[in-house]
Amino acid sequence: MSSNVAAAVPAAVSASRKESPGRWGLGEEPTGVGPSLQCRVCGDSSSGKHYGIYACNGCSGFFKRSVRRRLIYRCQVGAGMCPVDKAHRNQCQACRLKKCLQAGMNQDAVQNERQPRSTAQVRMDSVESETEPRLQPLATPPALAGPSSRGPTPVSAARALGPQALMPPGHHHFMASLITAETCTKLEPEDADENIDVTSNDPEFPSSPYSSSSPCALDSIHETSARLLFMAVKWAKNLPVFSNLPFRDQVILLEEAWSELFLLGAIQWSLPLDNCPLLALPEASAGGSSQGRLVLASAETRILQETISRFRALAVDPTEFACMKALVLFKPETRGLKDPEHVEALQDQSQVMLSQHSKAHHPSQLVRFGKLLLLLPSLRFISSERVELLFFRKTIGNTPMEKLLCDMFKN
């Protein structure tokens, strides 16, 4: 990776290097650790007693943040039975918190500097009594102005997901892997070692750094774009079904889908593409000053803005984004694939997941699934060359995008 790109994504690169080697169950379990010295939540090595039980630093820190910030979690898979162990503890925050409470962690033991301990409560549907199930709507955060310097913020993270449809075990596993990949790419510097995905009741959104076309604002957009691209590559790598494909197929699929993955990520994480100053300067980014190129740039800009509006109108949720990313990644018609049948099967599974999720969580929107599918072709109306020119040319210079993707993939 070029020095410019390396400088543009230090947080993402640093975070990826901090990942636990056992996330996918590939790391060795600690030896010589008795049951009393293991974390009662995830089974990792305990660092002592935390909030009444033996726990590791990761689970104790997760529990403390959840209680202090009064965080709301939903089981994104919906069954409330996600595995919580060393390799999968970051997969589902709802099930992790549920297990913390079941293991005996004491909420009142959490010291809260901002409010009395009696008001430090955690509200989570999956912890409620099974005899009285009910759903509480989550507060929708105000419109996001754009990613802050701490990293992008998901536009739909606080939206209620509703009940989960019954699905075969194989589909459940596939959905869980998609959500796991989503979780592993939601990074903030303070939580980089655990990859915690949280939803706060009272989020604070900073002012947008993109309100003008100043050099500082443009630099912020280029830096955030590089980070989003890195996260898109990392998301694909974190999909077990993707990493199980022949390496050549992985490279081909990623080179084919990178611009669509980037645009989906930019929309999901609220990069303000609709009023981005880069899009307001077509004469500076159209690759030349000819009238034809300016007209093409203007048309692509209009299509992009219309696409963003359609995503916002549908209020696409995180699970739908995950399924849509999988749909644009797994294209069996891509030339040169060694195993197109396997890729087609993965695309079919992604489509089934999206359909089932839409029916289960938006039962009154009978045409929602179709509308979501119709959003995807519009992402291809903006050429990858145009996306590269707008968001990455200043950062990578003349470095071929294929080389950049390869460097990110190998990182």
Curated annotation (Swiss-Prot):
Zinc finger (NR C4-type): 39-59, 75-95
Keyword annotations of the record: DNA-binding, Isopeptide bond, Metal-binding, Nucleus, Receptor, Transcription, Transcription regulation, Ubl conjugation, Zinc, Zinc-finger
Cellular compartments per GO CC: nucleus
DNA-binding region boundaries: 36-112
UniProt biased composition (Polar residues): 108-121
UniProt subcellular location: Nucleus
Description of post-translational modifications: Di- and tri-sumoylated in developing retina. PIAS3-mediated sumoylation is required for repression of cone-specific gene expression and rod photoreceptor development. Sumoylation on Lys-186 appears to be the main site.
Domain NR LBD: 170-411
PANTHER family for this protein: NUCLEAR HORMONE RECEPTOR (PTHR24083)
Known function: Orphan nuclear receptor of retinal photoreceptor cells. Transcriptional factor that is an activator of rod development and repressor of cone development. Binds the promoter region of a number of rod- and cone-specific genes, including rhodopsin, M- and S-opsin and rod-specific phosphodiesterase beta subunit. Enhances rhodopsin expression. Represses M- and S-cone opsin expression.
Protein family membership: Belongs to the nuclear hormone receptor family.
Protein name: Photoreceptor-specific nuclear receptor
Organism: Bos taurus (Bovine)
